[in-house]
Amino acid sequence: MAAQKDLWDAIVIGAGIQGCFTAYHLAKHRKRILLLEQFFLPHSRGSSHGQSRIIRKAYLEDFYTRMMHECYQIWAQLEHEAGTQLHRQTGLLLLGMKENQELKTIQANLSRQRVEHQCLSSEELKQRFPNIRLPRGEVGLLDNSGGVIYAYKALRALQDAIRQLGGIVRDGEKVVEINPGLLVTVKTTSRSYQAKSLVITAGPWTNQLLRPLGIEMPLQTLRINVCYWREMVPGSYGVSQAFPCFLWLGLCPHHIYGLPTGEYPGLMKVSYHHGNHADPEERDCPTARTDIGDVQILSSFVRDHLPDLKPEPAVIESCMYTNTPDEQFILDRHPKYDNIVIGAGFSGHGFKLAPVVGKILYELSMKLTPSYDLAPFRISRFPSLGKAHL
């Protein structure tokens, strides 16, 4: 039995946005919390780095829209505590053909949940956004709540807040062994720790930690090319021109999204919501970078629809997605060890939802009643994960 001073209420593995918000909620509730990160902070090896992410209430699934109501409140609270701007409201423009079922469902969801939005005809789109070239029959849905989260600033603010609340953040410590039990023992490259509860938010490394615990999630790890495109006239796609974030539906097998210029002067982020299979340990090997089909898709898209951008990317960065088969999150306890909690499979859309995800993982780790219905996020929805894996 660990001495009381060496015993943590909870250990969180992974200091990306989900792990940081989990540790933040634990520390807010005065729990003795240790946040472990295998890389030295800050780093760009996972899914939470970079300067910006889209924030929105526009979702196909009504449960995400409900969660986003509270997410906005917690983002604002963190912004107030940090004393720095973490969010900018720009609006989010969803584009698609008038008959696009996804667009119709999102609009119905926004109406049902009384989220302020506008439906824009082709003519209205041309008048408001003349530097978008639209196919015939294309319409728009503007989610007024949409905008940009300053990702790196948010991570730094969270890590500072965790420390100020008495939590401990230890980076450069890779977890090499987890021993379950009434107390969970976590062994890193530096030392061993014990805790009453363990939360695993390890992104594309999740299954490496779970396999020795007798379970493997159906997770697909992808390397994403995050592309930036140069404006021909600086500022033409900027916030100063009231240009919004956008999400284009139905043109390709996966969505194309964009954010107004800001991260790099004169460059606009436009990326494809998909990528190539990649082991997170090998994502930057030359062999992992041979397939640039998504960049070619984007070049064609930019040439055809964003005429004031040069159609060759000026900057290409990498990011990891960890996708589930249905692209919904995994927020659940280990089927055998109820003091081990798993947060995984954020499928490229988890950053904005992290304030509530962290709250849910905190509640699960402390054996509290979750604030939300977790049916969409249960491990049991994957029938292949039966008792044979345990």
UniProtKB/Swiss-Prot annotation:
The keyword Iron does not apply. Binds 1 FAD per subunit. A motif (Microbody targeting signal) lies at residues 388-390. The modification S-8alpha-FAD cysteine is found at residue 319. Expressed in the liver and kidney. FAD binds at residues 9-39. It is found in: Peroxisome. Its EC number is 1.5.3.1, 1.5.3.7. Gene3D superfamilies: D-Amino Acid Oxidase, subunit A, domain 2 (3.30.9.10), FAD/NAD(P)-binding domain (3.50.50.60). Keywords: Acetylation, FAD, Flavoprotein, Oxidoreductase, Peroxisome. InterPro entries: FAD-dep_OxRdtase, FAD/NAD-bd_sf, MTOX. Belongs to the MSOX/MTOX family. Metabolizes sarcosine and L-pipecolic acid. This is Peroxisomal sarcosine oxidase. It comes from Homo sapiens (Human).
